Each structure stands twice: as C-alpha cells, then as structure tokens.
Amino acid sequence: MLFNIANSVGKRTVKFAQSVGSFSLFSFAAVSSIIRPPLYLSLIIRQLLFIGFHSLPVVAMTTFFSGAVLALQSYIGFSRFSAESSIATVVVLSLTRELGPVLAGLMVAGRVGASIAAEIATMRVTEQIDALYTLSTDPIKYLVFPRVITAIITMPCLVLIGDIIGVMGGYLVGVYKLDFNSAAYLTSTFQYLEPIDVISGLVKAGVFGFIISIISCYSGYYSGKGAKGVGRATTSAVVNSSILILISNYLITELFFKV
C-alpha cells in the first residue's frame, strides 16, 4: 500500500518536473526567437486582428457590465454608511487596478487561448508541424513568435479600452439610475486616480498576454494524438492560463502596492 502511494507520488513528481523543464525550454526558445529574423509581418498583422480587434467586443461587454454592476453594488453597500460619494472612486480604481486586466485576461484566455491551442494541436496531429521542419522553417518562430509578440502588444490596448468602457458603464448607472450629478461623479472619478493605478493594470495586461499565448502555444505544440489530444490541449490551455493569470495578478499587485 505504502509502496504504491510512494510510486504514484514519485511518478507524478517526475512528470511535473519534466513538464516544467519542457515548458521552460519552450518559453526560452519562443522569447529568443524575437531577435532572430524573419519577422513574419503578415502573420503578426493577422494575429493583431484576431487577438486584438476581434476580442474587443467580448472585452467591451465584460468591462461595461462589470463597471455598471460595481457601481450599483457599491451604492447598495455604501449607502448604509452614507459614503455614496466614494462610488466613482471605487469603480475606477477597481477597474484599472484589478477587474479590467483580470476580466480581460480571462475572456481572452477563453476565446483566443482555446483557439490557438486547437489550431496548433490540429497542425501537430495532421503533421503540418513536421512539414515545416522539412521546409527548413522553425515552427516556434513561425507559429509561436507572432502569437506571443502580438498578445503582449494587444492586451494592454484591450485593457485600456476596457477600463474606459467600464468607467462609462459605472457612470451611466451612477448618473441615470442612481441620480448622481454628472460633473460631481466625473470629478470623483479622477480625483484619486493616479498614473500608477493605470500603469499597474497595463503591466498586468502585458504579462497576461504572454501567459495566455505561451501556454496556449505550448499546449497545442505538445498535444496528444487524435481528436482527444486536441480537446485536452484546448482545455489545458484555458485552465492553466486562467490559473496563472490569477496567481500572477496577486504577485504583480504585491509588487506595485506593497502594504
């Protein structure tokens, strides 16, 4: 009994160590490919549209209603302490520091991460990646580099737009439903907002973009065989990206806002 438990734990530990080592080497190869030609500009532009522009509606809807419900719930809670004037400040700080980057990251992980993993996994199953080797083309440079660099660039843009839309959602609820004065609400919104609040959110967005793209590419690149392998790669990409987004969010928050 004890031998079986020790054997199982040992196998899982070795497998985990192998996965960490494989992922580290894959990440290093992807990052180092940035400085090596060619740039594949056409692929980068295509990924800019897919990861950035096509993700904008999802991020916009998510942040708009998050800002709206945050304003509504803050009013319900703060009205008990006669602190309704702080609602706008809470909305803008919550969105720029936490909700904007995290929600955008989770939405992009679900939409883009799954698609990237499924696409590359399908290429692995159909031996298209092997065909790239025969054409003297580096698969990591051709498949991974455009997606990673594009995700790092587009995520801060998506988060910045999402923050603005989320604040707008809170503004509409505050002014038109809760009967706040428009000028007073806007003044309260920007009164305590500092550059570090926005910068920290954009840094998080860039890190989240790297996490989503590199994990999704890795999951697809090393997927199993057949349809089951593609499905597992897709699930692994979304789940692992989401978990690492939440973990890195705390670490970056700790780095920027030490208590």
Curated annotation (Swiss-Prot):
It is found in: Cell inner membrane. One of its GO terms (cellular component) is ATP-binding cassette (ABC) transporter complex. It comes from the Bacteria. It is a multi-pass membrane protein. InterPro entries: ABC_MlaE_roteobac, Permease_MalE. Its main location: membrane. GO terms for molecular function: phospholipid transporter activity. The chain crosses the membrane at residues 13-35, 49-69, 148-168, 195-215, 237-257. Could be part of an ABC transporter complex. Belongs to the MlaE permease family. NCBIfam families: MlaE family lipid ABC transporter permease subunit. This is Probable ABC transporter permease protein RC0129.
